[in-house]
């Protein structure tokens, strides 16, 4: 397994080993290596104190969290966090321990981690240290807290969102006691900085198992996104919808490609429905004005979570054109591409397909057919490099 670790990381481990320390790779990189996946980044630990790491690696070492024992090592274009093996003191701010005690025990260090699948260490020789059954849970596809789950979530409430994120991205189930503790401790999420919440939601929404997570845990997600709660169980009372507002929403999120613009657009697109609900004389439900109401609520959420400008603009653009209707004809598709641009138009077609896929199964094929045809026409125009806007015309020299 170590042969899959990048050479610069192996060199760092070797230098620590040659200097008399006992280094290990830890956390998500070990989990991903065991899954056969490519790690996004690498973290390591050893008994070396921060000042020893700084001296050993010289210009490659950067003090990014000395109080908690963390030094970032940069070599060969890779940044690796080295955190000295430690035990954590009490948590007062639901994020950082008030004190840490450095140790020379890898088992003690692993005991402070969040989930068993993240509490496995890998030595430079390829030996695994797994005191909490992480490999077994990894094989079974189970997320379980290390030790007492209530304590883990009390230490850092963001771990609750991390739990949901891993369930979404990895497609794992959550062990019963861990689920119960996450629900009992969910109010702790109110104290978490919006930036940290936003970072976790971005990853959660782009997971392959996102629909199941949204349907299973709206009570937890509703702490950080209270706007979703009125949608849960809201009967649309409309023959075109067999799902309540929240289930429809959750299904649309999972039905679009996993880009942040599309996933956020679908999460937000129907938030205004409950406040716009009316029934006609036949008892049929209608939601007049819900698109504008949803867009307004989306603006509040994006401001609160401090979306970066480009993502906010992208979501805003998709919500603005969400209700566009046009026939699956070449001229109409070309006209829409000219109006919105290629990217927004492609996204619009994806939202149309997802929105219809999450309505009544009866007539689904009929509802999808024109949008599939429009997407084929879009692809044809794109392949022909058809001019779609005046700006493109000027660039092309026409």
Give the residues covered by each predicted segment:
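Catalytic cores of the polymerase beta-like nucleotidyltransferase superfamily
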Residues: 1-398
């Amino acid at each position: 397994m170590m042969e899959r670790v990048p050479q610069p990381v192996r060199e760092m481990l070797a230098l620590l080993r040659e200097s008399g320390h006992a280094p290990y790779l830890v956390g998500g990189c070990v989990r991903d290596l065991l899954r056969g996946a490519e790690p996004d980044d690498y973290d390591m630990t050893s008994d070396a104190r921060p000042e020893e790491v700084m001296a050993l690696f010289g210009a490659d070492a950067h003090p990014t969290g000395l109080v908690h024992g963390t030094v970032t090592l940069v070599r060969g274009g890779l940044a690796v966090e080295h955190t000295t093996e430690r035990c954590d003191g009490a948590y007062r701010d639901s994020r950082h321990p008030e004190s840490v005690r450095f140790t020379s025990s890898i088992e003690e260090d692993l005991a402070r981690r969040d989930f068993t699948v993240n509490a496995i260490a890998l030595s430079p020789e390829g030996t695994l240290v797994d005191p909490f059954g992480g490999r077994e849970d990894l094989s079974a596809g189970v997320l379980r807290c290390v030790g007492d789950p209530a304590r883990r979530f009390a230490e850092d409430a963001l771990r609750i969102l991390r739990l949901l994120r891993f369930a979404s991205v990895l497609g794992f189930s959550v062990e019963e006691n861990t689920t119960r503790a996450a629900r009992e401790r969910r109010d702790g999420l109110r104290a978490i900085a919006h930036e940290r919440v936003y970072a976790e939601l971005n990853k959660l929404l782009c997971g392959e198992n996102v629909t199941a997570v949204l349907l299973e845990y709206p009570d937890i997600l509703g702490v950080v996104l209270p706007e979703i709660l009125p949608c849960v169980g809201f009967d649309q009372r409309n023959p075109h919808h067999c799902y309540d507002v929240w289930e429809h929403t959750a299904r649309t999120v999972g039905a679009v490609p996993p880009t942040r613009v599309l996933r956020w657009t679908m999460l937000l697109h129907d938030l205004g429905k409950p406040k716009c609900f009316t029934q006609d004389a036949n008892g049929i439900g209608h939601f007049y004005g819900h698109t504008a109401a949803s867009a307004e609520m989306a603006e509040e959420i994006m401001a609160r979570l401090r979306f970066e400008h480009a993502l906010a603009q992208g979501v805003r653009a998709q919500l603005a054109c969400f209700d566009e209707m046009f026939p699956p004809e070449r001229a109409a598709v070309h006209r829409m591409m000219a109006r919105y641009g290629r990217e927004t138009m492609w996204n619009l077609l994806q939202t149309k397909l997802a929105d219809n896929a999450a309505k009544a199964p009866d007539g689904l094929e009929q509802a999808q057919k024109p949008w599939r045809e429009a997407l084929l026409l879009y692809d044809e125009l794109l392949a022909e490099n058809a001019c779609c806007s005046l700006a493109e015309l000027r660039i092309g020299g026409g």
